């Protein structure tokens, strides 16, 4: 259950497998994740930062207590979204930092994942000067920067946002692909899924024509 505003909430049922958990991220979320495997207290040498379309800010705090010494370091992320006259989305991100640079590991790398941009163009400036972006092939626009304390990084990703139906269709393909077995019903549903043109066709197909298991239909319909 999550709340919208201060008064009325909305209940959502999110169906997932036992091996995964449902996670909701609001527009503009900036989510830093450590690449370290297992639990630990040292500040990470490599970070993955997930950026979701929208406007948002996040300041990450790190200290040197794991090394039993003083020192603080702050990394600030500011995300902004604009739309061009042609309907393209420009998701920008500015990264600044301050404090004791000795707190973080030397040679830190930050992997930036623009979650809602499945493909697009990247513009990178370091210290106000254009720089080449190290683009990584992944399921969304991803680049890696060699982070230096005190430097300013400006990234702009221009992309055309997927329609709600196209995004749902890709998710439906993953759900059907992950179903147990290869029975004829699943195979037929996967094939006919490719022929759907809009949400109305999809709703009619899965509610009235499909012989898919009820739990699968519920998962397919939950994002409508």
Question: What residue ranges belong to the model's regions?
Answer:
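Sequence-level detector for tyrosine residue identity
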Residues: 2, 58-61, 137, 153, ...
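Intrinsic disorder/low-structure terminal segments
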Residues: 51, 60, 72-76, 136, ...
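Mature N-terminal, pre-catalytic/accessory segment of carbohydrate-active enzymes
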Residues: 150, 157-224
């Amino acid at each position: 259950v999550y709340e919208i505003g201060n008064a009325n909430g909305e209940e959502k049922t999110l169906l997932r497998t036992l091996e995964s958990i449902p996670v909701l991220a609001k527009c503009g979320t900036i989510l830093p994740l450590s690449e370290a495997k297992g639990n630990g207290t040292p500040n990470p040498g490599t970070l993955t930062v997930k950026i979701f379309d929208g406007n948002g800010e996040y300041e990450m705090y790190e200290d040197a207590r794991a090394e039993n010494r003083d020192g603080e370091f702050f990394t600030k992320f500011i995300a902004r979204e604009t739309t061009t006259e042609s309907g393209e989305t420009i998701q920008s991100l500015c990264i600044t930092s301050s404090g004791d640079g000795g707190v973080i590991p030397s040679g830190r790398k930050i992997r930036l994942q623009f979650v809602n941009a499945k493909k697009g163009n990247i513009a990178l400036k370091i210290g106000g000067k254009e720089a080449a972006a190290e683009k990584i092939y992944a399921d969304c626009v991803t680049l890696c920067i060699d982070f230096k304390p005190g430097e300013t990084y400006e990234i702009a990703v221009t992309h055309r946002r997927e329609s709600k139906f196209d995004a749902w269709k890709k998710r439906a393909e993953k759900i059907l692909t992950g179903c147990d077995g290869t029975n004829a019903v699943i195979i037929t549903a996967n094939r006919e899924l490719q022929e759907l043109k809009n949400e109305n066709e999809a709703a009619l197909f899965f509610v009235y024509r499909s012989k898919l298991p009820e739990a699968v239909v519920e998962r397919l319909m939950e994002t409508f």
